[in-house]
């Protein structure tokens, strides 16, 4: 039987020390995975599967051409809130600012007034006489019968605005070459569809699931001018970071807005291959129910400008947003440059002027979380073009309104 020996725990004196040894850190060799990564199922009924379905759909839309992209975005039809540009809801402009993430700035942008080319005194005198002739023509030389019920603006003021727009566009084309290559649409149709906010489905077989809140604008301006080149921005994108947008926590049906289910549309007034794909200026007529005197008698004078602001905001947001969609931008691919448009709203006597700059179309809950951009609307108060027509003369013709019309139409890239 072998004898057991006791080993000493102390190091022997003759062993070398560790001080002269250097430890070298070597990187571990990264091994390629032998199997593909584990991803959630596309068919399972789980939150992870739903997230993967959304990611795959976003990749598919982003890789598609513009025409197919618009079809994929508007393909699924659900109940959506229909936003009417001309609404008599109280304080509708605040609601529309929240739904479109738009900040309102009183007055017109300074850059627009500085960059706009001006016409000479002789040319302005010709334009002033032209506006006078158009007004006198509608009052003295046009045979007018009594209009149908609730069609006074369409049948009496509509022809005046049409003649005014055509005459001014034709006269200023010699000073603004962009108007020579422009396209003038009469009674066009403009549509825009977007998502903003989310809700929990209260009932039905989809009860308890989160759902984005959908909105649709179907607008019918009196006329609009489209051009082949994009108008310059009124302000840099970074200028919108500090703008304030009203925050409304109430549901849209309390405005009130009503939900309908029909085809989702995104349309600028022209088809996708049209070279005049950028907006210049829209012209709108107020409805027959809009009476300044009646609203004053009902102690709603403060809602006159609210109505006009809401109209300008919704119409320009729909038109400018559709232009951005035509260029391939959408909710998950935000705009890389601002899109701008202008609008004029009138009842034949009073004119309101608005400028809109679209800085973002990422309005859904997922894309708006860390998005400091905001859209901006500039607008003026109502300005009266003339007082009346007496003895074949226009009384009180306002040169400031004519100058603003010229300034809008002289805007060019």
What are these model-derived regions, one by one?
Residues 2-304, 379-413:
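Charge-rich, low-complexity intrinsically disordered linkers/tails
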Residues 296-365:
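Internal, well-ordered interaction modules that form the hydrophobic cores of assembly/scaffold domains
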Residues 352-389:
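Polybasic, proline/glycine-rich intrinsically disordered low-complexity segments
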């Amino acid at each position: 039987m072998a004898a057991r020996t006791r080993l000493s725990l102390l190091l022997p004196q003759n062993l070398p020390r560790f001080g002269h040894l250097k430890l070298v850190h070597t990187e571990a060799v990264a091994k390629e995975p032998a199997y593909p990564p584990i991803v959630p199922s596309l068919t399972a009924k789980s939150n992870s599967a739903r997230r993967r379905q959304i990611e795959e759909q976003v990749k598919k839309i982003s890789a598609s051409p513009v025409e197919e992209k618009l079809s994929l975005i508007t393909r699924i039809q659900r109940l959506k809130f229909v936003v009417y540009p001309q609404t008599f809801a109280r304080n509708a402009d605040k609601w529309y600012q929240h739904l479109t993430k738009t900040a309102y700035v009183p007055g017109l942008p300074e850059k627009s007034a500085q960059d706009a080319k001006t016409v000479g005194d002789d040319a302005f005198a010709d334009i002033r006489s032209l506006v006078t002739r158009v007004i006198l023509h509608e009052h003295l030389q046009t045979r007018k019968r009594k209009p149908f019920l609730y069609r006074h603006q369409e049948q009496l003021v509509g022809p005046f605005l049409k003649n005014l727009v055509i005459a001014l566009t034709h006269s200023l084309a010699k000073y603004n070459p962009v108007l020579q290559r422009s396209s003038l649409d009469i009674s066009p149709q403009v549509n825009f569809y977007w998502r903003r906010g989310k809700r929990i489905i209260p009932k039905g077989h989809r009860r308890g699931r989160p759902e984005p809140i959908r909105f649709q604008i179907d607008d019918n301006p009196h006329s609009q001018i489209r051009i082949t080149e994009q108008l310059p921005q009124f302000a840099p994108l970074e200028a919108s970071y500090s703008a304030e947008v009203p925050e409304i926590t109430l549901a849209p049906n309390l405005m009130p807005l009503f939900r309908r289910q029909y085809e989702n549309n995104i349309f600028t007034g022209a088809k996708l291959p049209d070279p005049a794909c950028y907006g210049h200026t829209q012209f709108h007529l107020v409805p027959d129910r809009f009476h300044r005197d009646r609203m004053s008698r009902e102690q709603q004078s403060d809602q006159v400008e609210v109505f006009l602001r809401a109209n300008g905001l919704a119409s320009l947001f729909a038109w400018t947003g559709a232009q951005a969609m035509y260029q391939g931008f959408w909710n998950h691919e935000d705009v890389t440059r601002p899109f701008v448009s202008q609008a004029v709203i009138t009842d034949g006597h009073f004119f309101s002027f608005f400028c809109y700059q679209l800085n973002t179309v990422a309005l859904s809950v997922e894309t708006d979380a860390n998005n400091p951009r905001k859209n901006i609307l500039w607008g003026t108060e109502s300005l009266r073009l003339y007082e009346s027509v007496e003895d074949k003369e226009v009384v009180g013709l306002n040169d400031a309104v004519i100058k603003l019309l010229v300034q809008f139409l002289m805007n060019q890239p």
